[in-house]
């Protein structure tokens, strides 16, 4: 709610258990007055719940100066005063019970000196561990591999973040058999036990937030604030899915006359999680803990570019007490190990985030019933896609510019939600372009580790070459309004 408007409503919402944010505009007088007028217009619109609640009040009461009451004087009506003036709270659903409530993790506020220092210390600590070897985890044990690959810092190709052991097909089969054996026990574990483990995973991630953010920055080149936000998202996945599992475990009644119909959920079996490099921590965590908390044994095969970060997820899960064989960390070549696991007759669920080409192939492979396979595989695929933003003459151009810049250049445009084109109505085109160009010029380009960096490196040489090809196509087909220099590497 806006400061000074709807104080009673805000207090009532808080008393009922809802999270309420009070915000206050600040700055120069004229923009501030313009903002106030806009809010007044919104509050007096026909659809405004404030208007619906207040329109039957006497005009003298509405325009009277506000009176500050003591806390004890403020009363909250439990029912509407009249049938014609319903309470603004009547349209809200009942708040969730405390056991199932969900409060998102807060991002680090780097305006606080303490958190800035904590981040610096974390980077110093993580850099001392660079170059270590990370081996697959199969049936609770780390196993040696014939092949290892270097994961390098996109901001500095000479800096090896870690050496990752890649499994072969034989080791993938060993992992699959270990998962089959563990599933017999894991499926019978109570929902509360599974949820408690996943909640502990979230708590450990919260404790290690600064270090985990540093690993994300160094391995995939994501700027510090965005890396920190990704850790928050991973923590949210753990806590939300744990609460949801406890809710779903109760099942549902769908009764008709003369029948008692009870629906309950059961684990499907073995889940193969194939995670991307552009959200190496949040998406990998989300897909993995969702499968685990619902009682499925899970094999995590991360993208090669972000396999060290996935190893950190492995460490957290092990420290949280995940049983042997229930979770396994199986880095490997996608075309070999990934394909083998997708086509395995004992795979029940495939959770994939990545390109459309690979996702469609997974769908096609999963649809084929293999000899000895007694179930249909389920595929959850989030595939590549870029979003266009449409701006018409009614848009707030200041907000539009901020939104487009954030979407297009956040994580160097490597998110699947990144804006790759903007469609602007002709009447506001010139004004928008002028502001957009100036806003883009203000972006700081540099190494992801630097606090001032807003646009860091792309993930590898292949990605950079592809971007440069599109730049050349743009020069040939359209008018260039801005071109800025960028480092030769990254």
Where are the regions that the model predicts?
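Terminal low-complexity tails and localization/encapsulation signals of metabolic enzymes
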Residues: 24-170, 181, 188, 192-203, ...
């Amino acid at each position: 709610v806006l400061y000074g408007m709807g104080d009673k409503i805000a207090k009532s919402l808080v008393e009922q258990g809802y999270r309420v944010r009070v915000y206050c505009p600040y700055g120069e007088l004229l923009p501030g007055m313009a903002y106030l007028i806009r809010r007044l217009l919104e509050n007096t619109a026909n659809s405004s719940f404030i208007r619906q609640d207040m329109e039957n009040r006497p005009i003298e009461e509405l325009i009277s100066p506000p009176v500050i009451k003591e806390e004890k004087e403020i009363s909250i009506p439990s029912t509407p005063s009249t049938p014609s003036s319903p309470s603004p709270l009547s349209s809200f659903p009942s708040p969730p019970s405390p056991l199932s409530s969900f409060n998102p993790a807060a991002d680090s506020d780097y305006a606080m000196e303490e958190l800035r220092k904590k981040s610096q210390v974390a980077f110093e600590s993580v850099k001392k561990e660079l170059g270590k070897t990370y081996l697959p985890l199969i049936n609770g044990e780390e196993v040696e591999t014939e092949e290892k690959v270097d994961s390098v810092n996109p901001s500095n190709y000479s800096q090896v973040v870690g050496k990752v052991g890649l499994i072969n097909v034989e080791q993938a089969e060993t992992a699959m058999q270990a998962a089959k054996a563990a599933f017999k026990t894991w499926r019978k574990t109570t929902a509360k036990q599974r949820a408690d483990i996943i909640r502990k995973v979230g708590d450990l991630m919260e404790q290690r937030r600064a270090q985990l953010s540093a690993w994300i920055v160094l391995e995939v080149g994501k700027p510090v604030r965005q890396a920190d936000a990704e850790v928050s998202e991973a923590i949210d996945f753990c806590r939300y899915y744990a609460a949801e599992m406890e809710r779903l475990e109760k099942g549902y009644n769908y009764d008709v006359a003369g029948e008692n119909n009870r629906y309950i959920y059961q684990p499907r079996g073995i889940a193969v999680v194939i995670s991307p490099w552009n959200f190496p921590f949040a998406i990998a965590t989300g897909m993995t803990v969702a499968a685990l908390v619902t009682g499925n044994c899970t094999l995590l095969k991360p993208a090669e570019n972000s396999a060290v970060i996935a190893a950190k997820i492995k460490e957290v899960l092990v420290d949280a007490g995940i049983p042997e064989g229930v979770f396994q960390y199986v880095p490997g070549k996608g075309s070999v190990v990934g394909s083998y696991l997708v086509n395995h007759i004992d795979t029940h669920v495939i959770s994939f985030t990545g390109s459309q080409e690979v996702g469609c192939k997974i769908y096609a492979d999963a649809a084929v019933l293999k000899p000895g396979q007694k179930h249909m595989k389920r595929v959850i695929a989030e595939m590549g896609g870029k979003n266009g933003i449409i701006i018409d003459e009614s848009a707030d151009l200041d907000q539009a510019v901020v939104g487009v810049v954030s979407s297009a250049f956040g994580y160097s445009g490597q998110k699947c939600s990144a804006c790759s084109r903007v469609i602007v109505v002709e009447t506001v085109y010139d004004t928008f372009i002028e502001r957009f160009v100036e806003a883009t010029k203000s972006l700081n380009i540099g190494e992801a580790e630097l606090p001032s960096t807003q646009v860091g490196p792309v993930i590898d040489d292949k990605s950079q070459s592809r971007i440069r090809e599109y730049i050349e196509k743009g020069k040939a087909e359209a008018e260039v309004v801005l071109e800025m220099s960028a480092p030769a590497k990254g």
